[in-house]
């Protein structure tokens, strides 16, 4: 598995509140996460970067020779602990009040691959023929869409399109979507913030992912496509491609 990441401030925002992290110990033990902070420059940047730092610490502390009984439980407990830390910081420090962050990413331990998701960053599985979103956006507009109250076309222009219904650090407990991923040999993983998926719809994104480029050129190409389509938000993406 080859892992590469890229972040860009975009063309509109004054600061970049996105943060990414990845650690690869070996082919069977790795992690990768994207966090999109919110709550003003200082709060949003702090929430996303601190979350990534704490994920790094938790993953580095794992011993591959002592397999976890349940990776999903470890992910849930780790994110709950980080959530409580960010939440307490926001209560105690006035300049960080109201901060929070999305969290979307994957953890592979001894060849078992799991994902965790909070917010509206996304995880996709892709190959030459298909792009599949495996996460559900935790947004007000997506809840309307899932309940049949608006159409997909209406959701694209809805004034509350960016309102989150779930984020890390905004309350004592956080809901986390967790699941196992069983990749086929031809399948790869994309993790990205909404600054990418709002600029490139499914067809454009799939086309960009299948450009005949080496991984370093491909990630630059995708980022540039998002900038050319508006670049109205910070853009962050991680590609995990099987060799």
Language-model features: locations:
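PP2C/PPM-type serine/threonine phosphatase catalytic domain
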Residues: 1-243
């Amino acid at each position: 598995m080859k892992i590469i990441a890229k972040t860009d401030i975009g063309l509109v925002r004054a600061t970049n509140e996105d943060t990414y992290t990845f650690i690869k110990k070996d082919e069977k033990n790795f992690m990768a996460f994207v966090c999109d902070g919110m709550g003003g420059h200082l709060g949003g940047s702090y929430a996303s970067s601190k979350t990534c730092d704490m994920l790094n610490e938790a993953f580095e502390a794992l011993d591959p020779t002592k397999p976890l009984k349940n990776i999903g439980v470890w992910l849930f407990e780790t994110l709950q602990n980080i959530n409580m830390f960010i939440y307490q910081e926001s209560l105690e420090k006035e300049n960080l009040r109201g901060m929070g962050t999305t969290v979307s990413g994957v953890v592979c331990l001894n060849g078992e691959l799991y994902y965790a998701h909070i917010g509206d960053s996304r995880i996709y599985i892709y190959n030459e023929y298909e792009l599949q979103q495996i996460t559900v956006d935790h947004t007000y507009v997506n809840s309307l869409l899932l309940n049949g109250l608006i159409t997909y076309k209406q959701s694209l222009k809805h004034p509350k399109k960016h309102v989150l219904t779930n984020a890390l650090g905004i309350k004592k407990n956080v809901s986390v979507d967790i699941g196992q991923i069983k990749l086929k040999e031809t399948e790869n993983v994309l993790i990205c913030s909404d600054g990418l998926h709002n600029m490139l719809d499914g067809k454009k994104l799939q086309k960009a992912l299948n450009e005949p480029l080496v991984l370093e050129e491909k990630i630059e190409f995708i980022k540039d496509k998002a900038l050319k389509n508006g670049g109205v938000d910070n853009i962050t993406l991680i590609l995990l491609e099987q060799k």
